[in-house]
Amino acid sequence: VSDDALAVVVVTHNSAGALAALGASLTPQLRGDDELVIVDNASSDATVSMARNLGERAQVIETRVNAGFAAGCRRGVQASAAPLLFLLNPDTVLADGALERLRAVAASRPDWAAWQPAVMLPDGRINTAGGVVHFLGIGWAGRCGHGAGGLATQPYEAAFASGAALVVRRDDWQQLGGLRDDYFLYGEDLDLGLRLWLAGRRVGVEPRARVTHDYVFDRGAQKWFLLERNRWRTLLATYPLALLVALAPALVAAELGILAIAARDGWLRAKLRAQLATAIGLPRTLARRRAVQGTRRIGAAAFAAHLTAELDSPNLAAPRAAATLGGAYWRLMRLLLR
């Protein structure tokens, strides 16, 4: 197996309608030493039969329960051997040459542990040009909704790479434990990205590789529950202690503000469930924090450099006054952390 062989891992759940398009764009780009592993999370439609139709080289793993995206990815990684892992959503389509461009990053950027292509929406706008993380732990798809003309023409770094189309070196995956399987869904890519930066590794984007993602932002209560619960799990485990102390007043104020927004927008119960889950899981989170911080190779100031005070996602919005105060607070904290 060559050093740039890819293990493509696709996790499915009732994804029958998407697999034909994915397969048509993906399988012609696979090399002889690449692998294709499809992990089906207890689909009730024709996903498994569609997956088997992708060809003999497709290894299809069926699970009896839907344990979530990260758990499915971990199962697929365990069943593969290639040195580069490519975690790919089933509702994606690869542009011509995307795999070769992503593969080439392994040699051209040896300090990158993880990277992504430019992930595009079906209408040609950007879905994500690299993940962005607010200092409160809120993450989002960078430049979502912007025109493709604003994309860079050379590789660049980002806070985290999107789990919709995520390349990770197997060595780094194994050293840091890969995606957290207790997240079920949402934020596991952000968590991995911050852990990689904390460990002294780097994360980036190869914008010349393009993948189209049939993405729609879900505003359901269950998503808000998972986003908020997982935000706190990531924040408490990955942020250096000096940064947590510096942010404590802002985190408390933000919780009050988010509670008010949740009450206004109809997901207060989901937010309260997330707080309860965070409290109940605190002993486990603190135990995990000790393990994560044991891998740390950079200080609080260097880690903070990968966070931002700007909240420019079209799917998330903060009141102007709160954004202004947050920006001033963050600038002050960055100075104190130096």
Functional labels for PLM-detected ranges:
Residues 85:
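Short aromatic/hydrophobic "clamp" motif used to bind/position activated sugar donors
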Residues 93-133:
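Conserved donor NDP-sugar-binding/catalytic core segment of glycosyltransferases
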Residues 18-20, 45-53:
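Acidic helix N-cap motif at the loop->helix transition within catalytic regions
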Residues 199-307, 326-327:
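Active-site-adjacent helix/loop segment of glycosyltransferases
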Residues 24-33:
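Short, acidic, metal-binding catalytic loop of nucleotide-sugar glycosyltransferases
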Residues 159-210:
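A short, conserved alpha-helix in the catalytic core of glycosyltransferases
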Residues 25, 40-49, 65:
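A conserved acidic beta->alpha catalytic loop
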Residues 62-80, 90:
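Glycine-rich, basic loop-to-helix element that forms the pyrophosphate-binding segment
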